Regions:
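Bacterial N-terminal signal peptides that target proteins for export
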Residues: 1-11
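C-terminal motif of bacterial Sec signal peptides marking the signal peptidase cleavage site
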Residues: 18-21
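A short, solvent-exposed, low-complexity linear motif enriched for acidic/polar residues
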Residues: 23-188
């Protein structure tokens, strides 16, 4: 377990160093580049669970030096996904990833990504399903990155199912989704 946390810390620090080294220059350079956002899930021990599915209805990237992460869209966002797509997080362990979003965006600096989640379901191995109450349908991920002209930037987000699914002790044991999403890789 400690080795898993050490590996995750190493990956996060390495990703941060890579991101910071690629973050020079002005916030807008003219032209466009492409951003690809991939999704993965760290290995978990949910021995009675068959799947944890989430429906993502939006992936937005935010430009500029916005560090306040407003709760409403301030007009500085660019939508990469505008239609719902459902992902089973438990199929994304052991290094597996899936393309979450891809799109052409103005070249320049970006400060964060937002995932918008409309629903989530946990399915047990016996086939019974439990709807997960979503604590917040918006997940802001502060991650400065740069998209260069005529280049493709790629990042991977770890949506940690084990840390995200919680039991509500005060409301008859209902299940809650409190998304824990961490950037684990960035490249061009």
């Amino acid at each position: 377990m400690a080795r898993h946390h050490a590996l995750r810390l190493f990956l996060a620090c390495g990703s941060l160093a890579l991101i910071l080294s690629c973050n020079g220059g002005s916030s807008h350079t003219g032209g466009t580049g492409t951003i690809q956002v991939h999704l993965t899930d760290a290995p978990i021990d949910l021995s009675t669970v068959q799947s944890v599915t989430v429906t993502i209805t939006g992936v937005l990237v935010y430009r500029g030096s916005d560090t306040m992460m407003p709760q409403v869209d301030d007009g500085g966002s660019i939508a990469l996904v505008t239609h719902p797509e459902t992902f089973d997080l438990l199929t994304l362990t052991g290094g597996a990833t899936t393309l979450l979003a891809s799109g052409e965006v103005p070249a320049g600096s970006y400060q964060r990504i937002r995932l918008e989640i409309s629903s989530a379901t946990l399915t047990y191995k016996d086939g019974t399903e439990a709807a997960l109450k979503i604590d917040s349908n918006k997940v802001d991920i502060p991650i400065p990155f740069h998209v260069a002209v005529d280049q493709t930037s790629t990042m991977t987000l770890d949506f940690d199912a084990a840390a995200s699914v919680q039991v509500n002790d005060t409301a008859s044991g209902s299940l809650i989704l409190r998304p824990v999403v961490t950037p684990v890789g960035m490249g061009s």
